[in-house]
Protein backbone atom coordinates (compact mmCIF):
# COMPACT_ATOMS: atom_id res chain seq x y z
CA UNK A 1 0.00 0.00 0.00
CA UNK A 2 1.28 3.46 -0.86
CA UNK A 3 2.71 5.70 1.83
CA UNK A 4 0.22 7.94 3.57
CA UNK A 5 0.60 11.70 3.76
CA UNK A 6 -1.73 14.39 5.05
CA UNK A 7 -2.66 15.24 1.49
CA UNK A 8 -2.49 11.80 -0.15
CA UNK A 9 -6.30 11.90 -0.26
CA UNK A 10 -5.91 14.27 -3.21
CA UNK A 11 -4.77 11.33 -5.35
CA UNK A 12 -8.05 9.47 -4.73
CA UNK A 13 -11.65 9.87 -5.85
CA UNK A 14 -13.30 12.69 -3.94
CA UNK A 15 -17.02 13.35 -3.60
CA UNK A 16 -19.11 15.91 -1.74
CA UNK A 17 -16.36 18.48 -1.30
CA UNK A 18 -17.35 21.99 -2.47
CA UNK A 19 -15.52 23.86 -5.21
CA UNK A 20 -14.11 27.28 -4.35
CA UNK A 21 -13.72 29.97 -7.00
CA UNK A 22 -10.80 31.62 -5.22
CA UNK A 23 -8.30 28.80 -4.66
CA UNK A 24 -5.57 31.23 -3.58
CA UNK A 25 -7.77 32.61 -0.80
CA UNK A 26 -8.66 29.08 0.31
CA UNK A 27 -4.98 28.12 0.45
CA UNK A 28 -4.19 31.15 2.61
CA UNK A 29 -7.01 30.33 5.03
CA UNK A 30 -5.87 26.71 5.26
CA UNK A 31 -2.29 27.83 5.88
CA UNK A 32 -3.54 29.93 8.82
CA UNK A 33 -5.56 27.03 10.21
CA UNK A 34 -2.47 24.86 10.00
CA UNK A 35 -0.79 27.13 12.58
CA UNK A 36 -3.73 27.17 15.00
CA UNK A 37 -3.73 25.09 18.21
CA UNK A 38 -5.35 21.65 18.12
CA UNK A 39 -8.98 21.52 19.23
CA UNK A 40 -8.57 18.10 20.85
CA UNK A 41 -5.56 16.16 22.07
CA UNK A 42 -4.06 12.78 21.28
CA UNK A 43 -4.46 11.50 24.83
CA UNK A 44 -8.18 12.26 24.75
CA UNK A 45 -8.58 10.39 21.44
CA UNK A 46 -6.72 7.42 22.90
CA UNK A 47 -8.91 7.41 26.00
CA UNK A 48 -12.01 7.39 23.82
CA UNK A 49 -10.65 4.47 21.81
CA UNK A 50 -10.06 2.53 25.03
CA UNK A 51 -13.65 3.18 26.11
CA UNK A 52 -14.99 2.12 22.71
CA UNK A 53 -12.97 -1.09 22.97
CA UNK A 54 -14.73 -1.79 26.28
CA UNK A 55 -18.07 -1.25 24.57
CA UNK A 56 -17.21 -4.01 22.07
CA UNK A 57 -16.97 -6.30 25.12
CA UNK A 58 -20.30 -5.18 26.66
CA UNK A 59 -18.42 -3.25 29.36
CA UNK A 60 -19.65 0.18 28.21
CA UNK A 61 -22.28 1.72 25.94
CA UNK A 62 -21.98 4.67 23.55
CA UNK A 63 -24.44 7.55 23.29
CA UNK A 64 -23.67 9.77 20.30
CA UNK A 65 -25.96 12.71 19.74
CA UNK A 66 -26.37 16.30 18.65
CA UNK A 67 -27.46 18.50 15.80
CA UNK A 68 -27.86 17.31 12.24
CA UNK A 69 -25.81 20.37 11.30
CA UNK A 70 -24.54 23.08 13.62
CA UNK A 71 -25.14 26.65 12.55
CA UNK A 72 -23.51 30.00 13.16
CA UNK A 73 -26.88 31.66 13.76
CA UNK A 74 -28.02 29.37 16.59
CA UNK A 75 -24.66 29.42 18.38
CA UNK A 76 -25.27 30.20 22.05
CA UNK A 77 -24.23 29.00 25.49
CA UNK A 78 -27.82 28.00 26.25
CA UNK A 79 -28.10 25.75 23.20
CA UNK A 80 -24.79 24.06 23.99
CA UNK A 81 -25.83 23.61 27.63
CA UNK A 82 -29.21 22.15 26.72
CA UNK A 83 -27.75 19.59 24.30
CA UNK A 84 -25.12 18.60 26.86
CA UNK A 85 -27.79 18.28 29.55
CA UNK A 86 -29.93 15.91 27.47
CA UNK A 87 -26.91 13.72 26.71
CA UNK A 88 -26.20 13.55 30.45
CA UNK A 89 -29.82 12.62 31.15
CA UNK A 90 -29.79 9.87 28.51
CA UNK A 91 -26.52 8.54 29.90
CA UNK A 92 -27.87 8.40 33.45
CA UNK A 93 -30.91 6.43 32.30
CA UNK A 94 -28.85 3.90 30.35
CA UNK A 95 -26.27 3.45 33.12
CA UNK A 96 -29.02 2.87 35.67
CA UNK A 97 -30.75 0.26 33.52
CA UNK A 98 -27.74 -1.48 31.93
CA UNK A 99 -25.26 -1.13 34.81
CA UNK A 100 -22.37 -0.11 32.55
CA UNK A 101 -20.57 3.21 31.99
CA UNK A 102 -21.87 5.35 29.14
CA UNK A 103 -19.47 6.97 26.67
CA UNK A 104 -20.75 10.47 25.92
CA UNK A 105 -19.97 11.55 22.37
CA UNK A 106 -21.48 14.73 20.97
CA UNK A 107 -22.26 15.54 17.34
CA UNK A 108 -20.99 18.96 18.25
CA UNK A 109 -18.09 21.42 17.97
CA UNK A 110 -17.46 20.66 14.30
CA UNK A 111 -20.57 19.26 12.59
CA UNK A 112 -20.86 22.16 10.14
CA UNK A 113 -20.57 20.47 6.74
CA UNK A 114 -23.17 18.31 4.99
CA UNK A 115 -22.97 16.12 1.87
CA UNK A 116 -25.30 16.94 -0.98
CA UNK A 117 -26.55 14.64 -3.74
CA UNK A 118 -26.57 17.53 -6.23
CA UNK A 119 -24.12 20.43 -6.52
CA UNK A 120 -26.96 22.81 -7.34
CA UNK A 121 -30.50 23.53 -6.19
CA UNK A 122 -33.30 25.01 -8.31
CA UNK A 123 -36.14 27.08 -6.83
CA UNK A 124 -38.76 28.80 -9.00
CA UNK A 125 -36.53 28.47 -12.05
CA UNK A 126 -33.41 29.88 -10.34
CA UNK A 127 -30.43 27.53 -9.96
CA UNK A 128 -27.79 28.16 -7.29
CA UNK A 129 -25.15 26.18 -5.42
CA UNK A 130 -26.52 23.69 -2.90
CA UNK A 131 -26.19 24.52 0.80
CA UNK A 132 -23.23 22.53 2.12
CA UNK A 133 -23.43 23.70 5.72
CA UNK A 134 -22.36 26.88 7.45
CA UNK A 135 -18.65 26.03 7.15
CA UNK A 136 -19.00 26.37 3.37
CA UNK A 137 -21.85 28.74 2.45
CA UNK A 138 -25.07 30.33 3.69
CA UNK A 139 -28.49 28.72 3.79
CA UNK A 140 -30.22 31.80 2.32
CA UNK A 141 -31.21 31.25 -1.30
CA UNK A 142 -29.20 34.06 -2.86
CA UNK A 143 -26.24 33.90 -5.22
CA UNK A 144 -23.98 35.68 -2.74
CA UNK A 145 -24.92 33.49 0.23
CA UNK A 146 -24.56 30.24 -1.71
CA UNK A 147 -21.05 31.00 -2.99
CA UNK A 148 -18.53 28.87 -1.01
CA UNK A 149 -16.48 31.24 1.16
CA UNK A 150 -13.14 30.09 2.68
CA UNK A 151 -13.49 32.69 5.48
CA UNK A 152 -16.24 30.52 6.94
CA UNK A 153 -13.63 27.91 7.87
CA UNK A 154 -12.08 30.37 10.32
CA UNK A 155 -15.45 30.88 11.96
CA UNK A 156 -15.95 27.11 12.03
CA UNK A 157 -12.70 26.74 13.96
CA UNK A 158 -13.52 29.63 16.30
CA UNK A 159 -17.02 28.39 17.11
CA UNK A 160 -15.76 24.84 17.59
CA UNK A 161 -13.08 26.07 20.00
CA UNK A 162 -15.59 28.13 21.98
CA UNK A 163 -18.02 25.22 22.12
CA UNK A 164 -15.32 22.83 23.32
CA UNK A 165 -14.22 25.28 25.99
CA UNK A 166 -17.75 25.52 27.36
CA UNK A 167 -18.32 21.76 27.17
CA UNK A 168 -15.14 21.10 29.13
CA UNK A 169 -16.29 23.57 31.78
CA UNK A 170 -19.69 21.89 32.01
CA UNK A 171 -18.14 18.41 32.15
CA UNK A 172 -15.67 19.24 34.92
CA UNK A 173 -17.27 22.16 36.75
CA UNK A 174 -20.14 20.52 38.64
CA UNK A 175 -22.88 20.79 36.01
CA UNK A 176 -22.64 17.01 35.53
CA UNK A 177 -23.43 16.22 39.19
CA UNK A 178 -25.40 12.95 39.09
CA UNK A 179 -28.02 14.00 41.63
CA UNK A 180 -28.69 17.14 39.60
CA UNK A 181 -28.94 15.12 36.38
CA UNK A 182 -31.39 12.72 37.99
CA UNK A 183 -33.54 15.59 39.24
CA UNK A 184 -33.95 16.64 35.60
CA UNK A 185 -35.00 13.10 34.74
CA UNK A 186 -37.52 13.08 37.58
CA UNK A 187 -38.90 16.31 36.18
CA UNK A 188 -39.43 14.58 32.85
CA UNK A 189 -41.11 11.60 34.51
CA UNK A 190 -43.51 13.79 36.49
CA UNK A 191 -44.32 16.16 33.65
CA UNK A 192 -47.06 13.95 32.22
CA UNK A 193 -49.27 11.02 33.11
CA UNK A 194 -47.62 8.94 30.38
CA UNK A 195 -44.18 9.63 31.82
CA UNK A 196 -45.02 7.79 35.02
CA UNK A 197 -44.13 4.45 33.41
CA UNK A 198 -40.46 5.49 33.50
CA UNK A 199 -40.53 6.45 37.18
CA UNK A 200 -39.01 3.20 38.43
CA UNK A 201 -35.81 3.69 36.43
CA UNK A 202 -35.42 7.29 37.58
CA UNK A 203 -36.05 6.32 41.22
CA UNK A 204 -33.26 3.73 41.09
CA UNK A 205 -30.62 6.44 40.82
CA UNK A 206 -32.11 8.37 43.74
CA UNK A 207 -32.03 5.21 45.85
CA UNK A 208 -28.37 4.53 44.98
CA UNK A 209 -27.34 8.07 45.93
CA UNK A 210 -29.45 8.09 49.11
CA UNK A 211 -27.88 4.80 50.20
CA UNK A 212 -24.38 6.17 49.70
CA UNK A 213 -25.23 9.27 51.73
CA UNK A 214 -26.79 7.12 54.46
CA UNK A 215 -23.63 5.05 54.98
CA UNK A 216 -21.52 8.18 55.24
CA UNK A 217 -20.16 8.50 51.71
CA UNK A 218 -20.12 12.15 50.67
CA UNK A 219 -21.36 11.96 47.09
CA UNK A 220 -20.51 15.62 46.56
CA UNK A 221 -16.83 14.78 47.01
CA UNK A 222 -16.68 11.78 44.67
CA UNK A 223 -15.21 13.03 41.41
CA UNK A 224 -16.89 10.38 39.25
CA UNK A 225 -20.33 11.48 40.48
CA UNK A 226 -19.71 15.13 39.69
CA UNK A 227 -17.63 15.17 36.50
CA UNK A 228 -17.76 13.31 33.19
CA UNK A 229 -15.56 12.63 30.20
CA UNK A 230 -17.15 14.17 27.13
CA UNK A 231 -15.95 13.67 23.57
CA UNK A 232 -16.78 15.31 20.24
CA UNK A 233 -17.40 13.94 16.77
CA UNK A 234 -18.42 14.94 13.27
CA UNK A 235 -18.39 13.65 9.73
CA UNK A 236 -14.91 14.25 8.35
CA UNK A 237 -16.30 15.60 5.10
CA UNK A 238 -14.38 18.83 4.41
CA UNK A 239 -10.98 17.26 3.81
CA UNK A 240 -9.03 20.51 3.24
CA UNK A 241 -10.19 21.68 6.70
CA UNK A 242 -9.48 18.30 8.31
CA UNK A 243 -6.01 18.19 6.75
CA UNK A 244 -5.22 21.66 8.09
CA UNK A 245 -6.03 20.46 11.62
CA UNK A 246 -4.05 17.21 11.39
CA UNK A 247 -1.06 17.09 13.74
CA UNK A 248 1.76 14.76 14.82
CA UNK A 249 1.60 13.88 18.52
CA UNK A 250 4.90 14.87 20.11
CA UNK A 251 4.82 11.94 22.56
CA UNK A 252 3.98 9.03 20.27
CA UNK A 253 4.77 10.44 16.80
CA UNK A 254 1.35 9.18 15.73
CA UNK A 255 -0.88 11.36 13.57
CA UNK A 256 -4.24 12.69 14.76
CA UNK A 257 -6.96 14.80 13.25
CA UNK A 258 -7.42 17.35 16.01
CA UNK A 259 -10.75 18.81 14.86
CA UNK A 260 -12.61 16.13 16.88
CA UNK A 261 -11.98 13.03 18.95
CA UNK A 262 -14.01 10.79 16.61
CA UNK A 263 -14.39 11.16 12.85
CA UNK A 264 -16.88 9.27 10.74
CA UNK A 265 -17.05 8.44 7.05
CA UNK A 266 -20.48 9.06 5.57
CA UNK A 267 -22.63 6.64 3.60
CA UNK A 268 -21.95 8.60 0.39
CA UNK A 269 -18.15 8.76 0.76
CA UNK A 270 -17.60 5.15 1.86
CA UNK A 271 -16.07 3.26 -1.07
CA UNK A 272 -12.77 1.80 -2.25
CA UNK A 273 -10.42 4.56 -3.51
CA UNK A 274 -12.43 7.15 -1.57
CA UNK A 275 -10.44 10.24 -0.62
CA UNK A 276 -12.21 10.20 2.75
CA UNK A 277 -11.18 6.60 3.44
CA UNK A 278 -7.61 7.45 2.41
CA UNK A 279 -7.50 10.41 4.80
CA UNK A 280 -8.87 8.38 7.71
CA UNK A 281 -6.39 5.58 6.99
CA UNK A 282 -3.53 7.66 8.30
CA UNK A 283 -5.01 9.24 11.42
CA UNK A 284 -5.07 7.47 14.78
CA UNK A 285 -8.49 8.71 15.91
CA UNK A 286 -11.30 6.20 16.35
CA UNK A 287 -13.29 6.05 13.10
CA UNK A 288 -16.98 5.54 12.41
CA UNK A 289 -18.36 4.18 9.14
CA UNK A 290 -21.97 4.86 8.17
CA UNK A 291 -23.69 1.79 6.70
CA UNK A 292 -26.84 2.23 4.62
CA UNK A 293 -28.82 0.11 2.13
CA UNK A 294 -26.35 0.84 -0.68
CA UNK A 295 -23.55 -0.88 1.25
CA UNK A 296 -21.78 -3.91 -0.20
CA UNK A 297 -20.68 -5.89 2.90
CA UNK A 298 -17.72 -7.44 1.09
CA UNK A 299 -16.50 -4.00 0.04
CA UNK A 300 -16.86 -2.84 3.64
CA UNK A 301 -14.56 -5.63 4.80
CA UNK A 302 -11.91 -4.37 2.36
CA UNK A 303 -12.37 -0.82 3.68
CA UNK A 304 -11.99 -2.05 7.26
CA UNK A 305 -8.78 -3.83 6.24
CA UNK A 306 -7.49 -0.49 4.93
CA UNK A 307 -8.51 1.47 8.02
CA UNK A 308 -7.71 -1.11 10.69
CA UNK A 309 -5.19 -3.68 9.40
CA UNK A 310 -4.32 -4.78 12.95
CA UNK A 311 -7.99 -5.32 13.92
CA UNK A 312 -7.53 -2.99 16.90
CA UNK A 313 -10.55 -2.93 19.21
CA UNK A 314 -12.10 0.53 19.50
CA UNK A 315 -10.76 1.74 16.17
CA UNK A 316 -13.84 0.99 14.00
CA UNK A 317 -17.50 1.65 14.79
CA UNK A 318 -20.17 0.65 12.28
CA UNK A 319 -23.08 3.09 12.41
CA UNK A 320 -25.90 1.38 10.54
CA UNK A 321 -28.80 3.40 9.14
CA UNK A 322 -31.19 1.15 7.26
CA UNK A 323 -34.64 2.28 8.30
CA UNK A 324 -37.35 0.35 10.10
CA UNK A 325 -38.59 -1.26 6.86
CA UNK A 326 -35.16 -2.32 5.57
CA UNK A 327 -33.18 -3.39 8.61
CA UNK A 328 -34.37 -7.01 8.60
CA UNK A 329 -33.14 -7.34 5.02
CA UNK A 330 -29.72 -5.72 5.39
CA UNK A 331 -28.37 -5.93 8.95
CA UNK A 332 -28.26 -9.76 9.27
CA UNK A 333 -26.16 -10.02 6.09
CA UNK A 334 -23.78 -7.33 7.32
CA UNK A 335 -23.35 -8.94 10.75
CA UNK A 336 -22.74 -12.36 9.18
CA UNK A 337 -20.07 -10.91 6.89
CA UNK A 338 -18.28 -9.06 9.69
CA UNK A 339 -18.38 -12.13 11.95
CA UNK A 340 -17.15 -14.38 9.13
CA UNK A 341 -14.04 -12.22 8.74
CA UNK A 342 -13.56 -11.86 12.54
CA UNK A 343 -13.58 -8.07 12.44
CA UNK A 344 -13.71 -6.31 15.80
CA UNK A 345 -16.24 -3.51 15.48
CA UNK A 346 -18.67 -1.61 17.66
CA UNK A 347 -22.27 -1.85 16.44
CA UNK A 348 -24.10 1.49 16.66
CA UNK A 349 -27.72 2.02 15.66
CA UNK A 350 -28.54 5.23 13.79
CA UNK A 351 -32.36 5.05 13.58
CA UNK A 352 -32.62 8.59 12.24
CA UNK A 353 -31.44 8.60 8.63
CA UNK A 354 -33.34 5.61 7.31
CA UNK A 355 -36.67 6.84 8.65
CA UNK A 356 -36.94 10.32 7.15
CA UNK A 357 -40.28 10.96 5.43
CA UNK A 358 -42.23 13.94 4.09
CA UNK A 359 -45.17 15.23 6.14
CA UNK A 360 -48.52 16.05 4.59
CA UNK A 361 -47.30 19.67 4.43
CA UNK A 362 -44.04 18.74 2.69
CA UNK A 363 -41.72 19.03 5.71
CA UNK A 364 -39.09 16.39 6.35
CA UNK A 365 -39.88 14.52 9.55
CA UNK A 366 -39.28 11.27 11.42
CA UNK A 367 -41.76 9.30 13.49
CA UNK A 368 -40.79 8.30 17.01
CA UNK A 369 -42.27 4.81 16.71
CA UNK A 370 -40.19 4.07 13.58
CA UNK A 371 -36.99 5.09 15.40
CA UNK A 372 -37.80 2.88 18.37
CA UNK A 373 -38.88 -0.04 16.19
CA UNK A 374 -35.68 0.04 14.14
CA UNK A 375 -33.50 0.07 17.24
CA UNK A 376 -35.52 -2.73 18.84
CA UNK A 377 -35.13 -4.84 15.70
CA UNK A 378 -31.39 -4.14 15.72
CA UNK A 379 -31.08 -5.36 19.31
CA UNK A 380 -32.79 -8.64 18.43
CA UNK A 381 -30.88 -9.19 15.17
CA UNK A 382 -27.49 -8.60 16.79
CA UNK A 383 -28.35 -10.87 19.71
CA UNK A 384 -29.42 -13.66 17.34
CA UNK A 385 -26.01 -13.41 15.64
CA UNK A 386 -24.02 -13.58 18.87
CA UNK A 387 -23.25 -9.84 18.79
CA UNK A 388 -24.72 -6.92 20.70
CA UNK A 389 -25.76 -3.32 20.24
CA UNK A 390 -22.99 -1.14 21.61
CA UNK A 391 -24.35 2.35 21.01
CA UNK A 392 -26.99 4.68 19.58
CA UNK A 393 -26.52 7.65 17.26
CA UNK A 394 -29.20 10.35 17.49
CA UNK A 395 -29.87 13.65 15.78
CA UNK A 396 -31.31 15.62 18.66
CA UNK A 397 -31.37 18.96 20.39
CA UNK A 398 -31.97 20.23 23.89
CA UNK A 399 -34.44 22.74 22.48
CA UNK A 400 -38.20 22.23 22.54
CA UNK A 401 -38.53 21.85 18.76
CA UNK A 402 -41.34 20.14 16.85
CA UNK A 403 -39.55 18.34 14.02
CA UNK A 404 -40.23 14.64 14.71
CA UNK A 405 -43.73 13.24 15.23
CA UNK A 406 -44.89 10.94 18.01
CA UNK A 407 -43.59 10.38 21.52
CA UNK A 408 -45.28 11.02 24.86
CA UNK A 409 -46.82 14.26 23.68
CA UNK A 410 -48.09 12.66 20.46
CA UNK A 411 -46.83 15.35 18.09
CA UNK A 412 -48.54 15.09 14.71
CA UNK A 413 -47.98 16.50 11.23
CA UNK A 414 -50.04 19.56 12.06
CA UNK A 415 -47.75 20.38 15.02
CA UNK A 416 -44.53 20.48 12.98
CA UNK A 417 -44.86 24.10 11.86
CA UNK A 418 -44.97 25.28 15.48
CA UNK A 419 -41.21 25.11 16.17
CA UNK A 420 -39.54 23.65 13.08
CA UNK A 421 -36.05 25.20 13.18
CA UNK A 422 -33.61 22.66 11.72
CA UNK A 423 -31.04 23.73 9.11
CA UNK A 424 -30.99 20.23 7.68
CA UNK A 425 -32.78 17.10 8.93
CA UNK A 426 -35.46 16.79 11.65
CA UNK A 427 -34.20 16.32 15.21
CA UNK A 428 -35.66 14.74 18.31
CA UNK A 429 -36.48 17.29 20.98
CA UNK A 430 -35.26 16.82 24.55
CA UNK A 431 -38.31 14.89 25.74
CA UNK A 432 -38.38 12.61 22.70
CA UNK A 433 -34.66 11.83 22.99
CA UNK A 434 -35.02 11.01 26.67
CA UNK A 435 -38.12 8.88 26.11
CA UNK A 436 -36.33 6.95 23.37
CA UNK A 437 -33.41 6.28 25.71
CA UNK A 438 -35.72 4.94 28.45
CA UNK A 439 -37.21 2.47 25.97
CA UNK A 440 -33.93 1.42 24.38
CA UNK A 441 -32.24 0.88 27.75
CA UNK A 442 -35.14 -1.29 28.94
CA UNK A 443 -35.10 -3.33 25.72
CA UNK A 444 -31.35 -3.94 25.86
CA UNK A 445 -31.51 -4.95 29.51
CA UNK A 446 -34.43 -7.29 28.79
CA UNK A 447 -32.35 -8.98 26.11
CA UNK A 448 -29.34 -9.45 28.36
CA UNK A 449 -26.71 -6.85 27.50
Question: Would you name each region that the model predicts?
Answer:
Residues 52-55, 93-95, 279-280, 381-384:
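A general structural signal for short secondary-structure junctions and capping/turn motifs
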Residues 47-49, 273-276, 303, 332-334:
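Glycine-rich, charged/polar anion/phosphate-binding loops
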Residues 109, 352-353:
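Short glycine-enriched loops at secondary-structure junctions
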Residues 1-61:
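N-terminal basic/disordered segments at the start of proteins
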Residues 300-303, 309, 315-347, 353-402, ...:
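Non-transmembrane, aqueous-exposed alpha-helical and coiled segments at domain scale
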Residues 69-70, 74-323, 366, 374, ...:
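Active-site-facing alpha/beta catalytic cores
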Residues 61-66, 103:
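Short, hydrophobic/glycine-enriched beta-strand segments
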Amino acid sequence: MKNWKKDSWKDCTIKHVPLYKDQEKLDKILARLNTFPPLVFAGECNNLKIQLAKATERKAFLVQGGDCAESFKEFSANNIRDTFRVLLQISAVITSEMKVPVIKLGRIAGQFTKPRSLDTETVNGTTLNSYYGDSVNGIEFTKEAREPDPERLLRTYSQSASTLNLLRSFAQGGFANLRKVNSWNMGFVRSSKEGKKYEKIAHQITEYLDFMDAVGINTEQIIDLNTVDFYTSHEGLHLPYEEALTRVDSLSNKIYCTSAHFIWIGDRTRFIDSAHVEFCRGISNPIGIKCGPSLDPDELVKIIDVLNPDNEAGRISLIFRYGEKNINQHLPVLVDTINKHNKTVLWISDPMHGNTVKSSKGLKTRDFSALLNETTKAIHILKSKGSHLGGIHLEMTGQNVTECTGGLYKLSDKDLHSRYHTHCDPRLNANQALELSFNIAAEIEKNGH
